């Protein structure tokens, strides 16, 4: 983050030889700064065995904020001649650097102890006044001083050397026959105010000259405060007040002065008079110290310690120098690669303008380097192989680049095509900006948008496109032109028109978009528009906000956006219930369009206060406009995954509705209850919500409600639940189990009613309850024992529940249910595109008509829904094969592994389709989740049968199930490798092995296919990671394919993702290297999650998904790695998730039944 910020931090301080220097700015930052005065940090290269002579000229692009810094490996590795040459050069450099830097110390020390304290006051005054003026000039943007110092650096170095020897020789001569006795000088008032030397302008200008000599070191402070070309440091710079700067300089000057009058003489006095120095040998040392060079070394060493320690300590306290500097190596000079040699007429380096020169580089590109630096003499011989070259080589070996992006030119065309609406918007945005050439602007804007289109985690945006610096140059030039925004409406209209173009552009990418329901169209358009504003256009909106006076208000854009979206629908129909509610019969479409239309605000106030059921009115209006909402009411939504999706859809539309009313002066809001941040927090990060729930102050209200819950239900309920909990261990018959579950269901209803209604009665509170506590309620339902919840069966009597429970043993039980029961059955409706009411009534989950049209876009004409089953029966596997889920419904009380096995029999989506799916549905796929492709009855995925589990058992192996350790037995491996003939399957790419487990005749090897479960046995003792890893590698080696070369790296990197926290990383490692790997019966490589629960937890989701190196974002893990490794990965992660689910099941069961040990515990204690 602070890479560029630190690059010029020590530039002039260290780099007298015009070379790079690397400095460690981390835990030992201060120590490195101390010794950097004497030992040049280029020695770090020698320590790291990188002593190539020209390694100091590392050429690298200016990295973006999220990029890592890579140090290339030099060509002459362990070359002795290069080592000698390198040491020779930096040694000479170091000697001259020491002499130049020490000049000021020699002068001040000589004057201080040869005469008195006041003799150096004029020089000190000139020195510090020069320093303050210099920093003020830099702070104010006066950049000429920087250029002067850069161009005269050699002169100051030579002057410093001459001055050093001149003053040093005089000092030795003057003290040759004197016994130097150092005292701590004190300031005498008469001497201080009356000394003529205080007004000695000759000494004053000598101090100014000493500042110039010391400018390489003083530039350390300046560079810390200067504006550097990164967004983060720009924010840091404008937040640093000028008072802080002046205060820092004054305190720094005081300690600098204090170190001369107290620290140095005190130390030297102790050395001189210590009896330990009276031996003959040490007397000689003492004599040497009294001579010039010996004193210089001591003064030089001691001076840097208090000076820089105090300086950086004060910088920490004042907040000027950042505290969280985490980089270990830092580059100090900007070198860039560009396709255009003349683009960099000037570049803002810090707060200064630095001219750049261009030199020919390879592949028609140009090396741009600062004009005040010399071109490396042998730059053409550099080993310019950063990581991205090796990385692209690996990708090309697997045909990923050709498949997804093609050549560099194709990539740029692809980005420019996708960014056309926004580029058009930007090109018309700044008519008065100081950037006029359209080609340059298009190049800048393309790069500006590349990070968002290709993803923020990919390196392609850095190396396949224009340098990052061009984007910064664009904004810097705008800022230097004192740009101000006056006509806000003009920019509002531009943004809205751009959004409309962008939405229309993306709608055309979605197949069969017109077949979507009006509700899905509406919410999709709004989500896409809001995403555009909050992510892809956020830098621009922030820029408008920064340069507009008063602040740029984005609310009118949202309001207008919502109005445009709603304008495509029948507003009379929608607002009719609302008009009746406000008793304003004249509220119709014509009046809504008038700006002055205002309903009765008193009725609005009553609604917000909860006196009128406004929420029901809103629901009525939504249902009137979108009839399908009558079919999906909130109380009918089942498990957590579906309620997340439905809440998202519901609140997205509610936000549109709210913004529309706000634009028409209704001022009807749901306050902060549907704020975007909290909605995302609670709806899309369920497990994170559970984890933070116990320790975050913002959830105190919910936590207090839960604590009060025990008081409301009183002791009787607690005792009853305790007894019921104990009965679980003694269940003997299915009838006992059934009765207990029904009883527990009633208790759960009490708990849910308490959470829903035991609150304030305002409308905002009701939304709060539905949104936040409603999520908690579904979590409790999810982890309760009962396979049925109140959200599933609204008003079903006990007899009906008994019948359903008994019939649940039949796989096709749902088809035999009567209509009264079926209408309450919670079909999970993630996306309307895959559902139709008629199909649902028939028990079919998906809209095959729409899905079939999607398939025809992706696959051959002869491979459609009708013949997919015949392909399966013929035991043929094609890399274009796609078998859809049939209409069988999974029993609600079936184990999750049964569900997995049944799904595997019906769906196989190969990696071949991924590129087309990703292209056609992006960014549509960001809005719509395709979990329904592989899910049936999600409401009961994690209902745990009491026949196998109890609340006290987290890891219980399923009895009477055959398991096999990983790797697979050798006979099965041989079968896979040799017995699958080429005439049936052509494995040109190892990804085509996906689904081959479906063809294994398990019965032939004595494996019970139906009873082979993916389950984990809790045995982690005597863990041998290396042995297991070798087994993996041996297994990979059985297949001779070039793509396996990168498997090991991908395999390791998957578990070294920086985004994983330590807990998940350790948990993954335990499962990964466990000795008890279970063999999955089959595996699916699919661009979508197979099961609904994969979507729930953000941290766990990062385990199931890998970051795509092509477009960024999360993709199914099987998309970019081999199916076999994912086969194992999927198995392990499924077991990890199962373990966590069981753990939370235990926790929430304990919550429902109160706390086992006592009745006074807290939830935090329970979790501990």
Swiss-Prot record:
It comes from the Eukaryota. The gene is ycf78. Keywords: Membrane, Plastid, Transmembrane, Transmembrane helix. GO terms for cellular component: plastid membrane. It is a multi-pass membrane protein. The chain crosses the membrane at residues 43-63, 89-109, 132-152, 155-175, 203-223, 247-267, 293-313. This is Uncharacterized membrane protein ycf78. The keyword ATP-binding does not apply. It is found in: Plastid membrane. Belongs to the ycf78 family.
């Amino acid at each position: 983050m602070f890479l560029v910020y630190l690059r010029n931090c020590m530039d002039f301080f260290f780099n007298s030889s015009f070379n790079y220097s690397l400095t460690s700015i981390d835990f030992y930052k201060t120590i490195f700064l101390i010794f950097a005065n004497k030992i040049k940090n280029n020695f770090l290269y020698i320590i790291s065995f990188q002593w190539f002579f020209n390694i100091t000229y590392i050429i690298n692009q200016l990295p973006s904020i999220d990029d890592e810094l890579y140090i290339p490996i030099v060509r002459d590795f362990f070359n002795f001649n290069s080592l000698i040459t390198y040491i020779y050069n930096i040694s000479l450099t170091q000697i001259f650097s020491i002499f130049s830097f020490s000049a000021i110390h020699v002068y001040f020390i000589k004057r201080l102890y040869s005469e008195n304290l006041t003799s150096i006051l004029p020089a000190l005054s000139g020195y510090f006044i020069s320093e303050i003026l210099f920093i003020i000039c830099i702070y104010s943007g006066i950049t000429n001083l920087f250029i002067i110092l850069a161009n005269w650096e050699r002169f100051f170095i030579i002057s410093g050397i001459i001055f050093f020897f001149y003053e040093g020789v005089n000092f030795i001569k003057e003290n040759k026959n004197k016994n130097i006795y150092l005292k701590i000088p004190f300031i005498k008032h008469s001497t201080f105010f009356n000394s003529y030397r205080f007004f000695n302008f000759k000494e004053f200008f000598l101090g100014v000259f000493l500042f110039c000599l010391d400018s390489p070191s003083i530039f350390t402070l300046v560079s810390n405060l200067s504006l550097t070309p990164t967004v983060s440091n720009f924010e840091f710079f404008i937040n640093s007040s000028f008072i802080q700067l002046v205060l820092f300089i004054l305190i720094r000057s005081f300690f600098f002065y204090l170190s001369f009058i107290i620290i140095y003489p005190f130390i030297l006095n102790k050395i001189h008079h210590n009896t330990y120095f009276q031996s003959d040998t040490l007397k000689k040392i003492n004599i040497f110290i009294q001579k010039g060079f010996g004193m210089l070394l001591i003064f030089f060493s001691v001076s840097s310690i208090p000076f820089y320690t105090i300086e950086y300590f004060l910088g920490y306290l004042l907040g000027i120098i950042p505290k969280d500097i985490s980089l270990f190596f830092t580059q100090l000079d900007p070198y860039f690669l560009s396709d255009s040699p003349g683009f960099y007429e000037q570049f803002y380096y810090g707060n200064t303008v630095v001219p750049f020169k261009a030199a020919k580089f390879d592949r028609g590109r140009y090396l741009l380097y600062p004009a005040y630096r010399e071109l490396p003499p042998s730059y053409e011989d550099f080993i310019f192989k950063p990581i991205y070259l090796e990385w692209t080589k690996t990708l090309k070996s697997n045909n990923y680049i050709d498949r997804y992006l093609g050549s560099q030119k194709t990539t740029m065309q692809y980005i420019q095509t996708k960014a056309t609406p926004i580029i058009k918007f930007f090109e018309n945005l700044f008519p008065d900006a100081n950037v006029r050439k359209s080609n340059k602007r298009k190049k800048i804007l393309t790069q500006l948008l590349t990070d968002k289109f290709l993803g923020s985690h990919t390196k392609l945006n850095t190396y396949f496109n224009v340098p990052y610096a061009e984007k910064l140059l664009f904004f810097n030039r705008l800022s230097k032109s004192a740009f101000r925004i006056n006509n806000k409406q003009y920019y509002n209209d531009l943004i809205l028109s751009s959004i409309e173009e962008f939405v229309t552009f993306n709608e055309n990418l979605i197949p069969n978009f017109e077949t979507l329901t009006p509700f899905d169209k509406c919410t999709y358009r709004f989500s896409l528009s809001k995403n555009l504003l909050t992510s892809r256009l956020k830098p621009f909106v922030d820029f408008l906000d920064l340069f507009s006076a008063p602040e740029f208000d984005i609310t009118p854009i949202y309001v207008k956006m919502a109005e445009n979206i709603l304008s495509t629908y029948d507003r009379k129909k929608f607002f009719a219930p609302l008009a009746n509610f406000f008793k304003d019969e004249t509220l119709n479409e014509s009046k809504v369009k008038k700006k002055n239309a205002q309903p009765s605000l008193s009725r609005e106030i009553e609604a917000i206060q909860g006196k009128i059921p406004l929420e029901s009115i809103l629901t009525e209006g939504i249902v009137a406009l979108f009839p399908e909402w009558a079919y999906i009411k909130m109380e009918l939504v089942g498990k957590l995954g579906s309620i997340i999706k439905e809440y998202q859809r519901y609140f997205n539309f509610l936000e549109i509705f709210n913004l529309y009313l706000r634009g028409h002066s209704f001022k009807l809001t749901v306050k902060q209850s549907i704020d975007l941040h909290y909605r995302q927090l609670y709806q899309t990060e369920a497990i994170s919500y559970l984890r933070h729930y116990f320790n975050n102050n913002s959830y105190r209200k919910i936590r207090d409600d839960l604590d009060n819950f025990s008081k409301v239900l009183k002791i009787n309920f607690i005792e009853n639940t305790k007894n019921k909990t104990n009965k679980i261990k003694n269940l003997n018959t299915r009838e006992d189990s059934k009765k207990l579950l029904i009883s527990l269901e009633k208790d759960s209803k009490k708990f849910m009613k308490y959470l829903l209604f035991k609150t304030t009665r305002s409308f905002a509170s009701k939304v709060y309850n539905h949104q936040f506590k409603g999520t908690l309620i579904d979590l409790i339902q999810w982890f309760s024992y009962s396979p049925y919840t109140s959200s599933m069966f609204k008003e079903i009597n006990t007899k009906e529940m008994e019948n359903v429970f008994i019939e649940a043993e039949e796989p096709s039980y749902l088809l035999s249910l009567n209509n009264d029961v079926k209408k309450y059955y919670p079909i999970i409706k993630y996306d309307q595109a895959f559902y139709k009411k008629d199909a649902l009534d028939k028990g079919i989950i998906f809209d095959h008509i729409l899905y079939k049209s999607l398939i025809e876009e992706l696959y051959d004409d002869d491979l459609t829904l009708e013949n997919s089953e015949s392909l399966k029966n013929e035991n043929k596997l094609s890399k274009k094969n796609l078998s859809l889920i049939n209409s069988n419904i999974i029993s609600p009380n079936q184990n999750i592994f049964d569900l997995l096995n049944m799904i595997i029999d019906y769906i196989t989506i190969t990696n071949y389709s991924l590129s087309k799916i990703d292209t056609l549905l992006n960014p549509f796929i960001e809005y719509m989740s395709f979990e329904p492709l592989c899910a049936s009855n999600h409401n009961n995925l994690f209902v745990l049968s009491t026949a196998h589990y109890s609340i006290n058992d987290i890891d219980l192996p399923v009895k009477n199930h055959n398991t096999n350790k990983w790797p697979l037995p050798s006979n099965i491996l041989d079968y896979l490798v040799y017995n699958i003939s080429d005439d049936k399957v052509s494995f040109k790419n190892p990804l085509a092995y996906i689904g081959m487990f479906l063809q294994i005749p398990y019965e032939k090897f004595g494996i019970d296919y139906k009873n082979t479960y993916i389950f984990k046995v809790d045995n982690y003792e005597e863990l041998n990671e290396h042995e297991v890893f070798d087994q993996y590698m041996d297994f990979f080696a059985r297949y001779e394919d070039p793509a396996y070369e990168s498997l090991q790296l991908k395999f390791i990197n998957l578990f070294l993702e920086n985004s994983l926290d330590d807990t998940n990383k350790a948990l993954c490692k335990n499962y990964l290297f466990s000795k008890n790997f279970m063999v999955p019966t089959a595996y699916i490589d699919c661009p979508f999650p197979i099961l609904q629960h994969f979507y729930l937890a953000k941290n766990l989701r990062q385990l199931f998904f890998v970051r795509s190196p092509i477009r960024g974002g999360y993709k199914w893990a099987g998309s970019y790695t081999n199916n076999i490794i994912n086969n194992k990965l999927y198995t392990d992660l499924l077991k990890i998730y199962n373990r966590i689910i069981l753990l939370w099941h235990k926790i929430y069961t304990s919550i429902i039944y109160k706390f086992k040990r006592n009745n006074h515990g807290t939830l935090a204690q329970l979790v501990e």
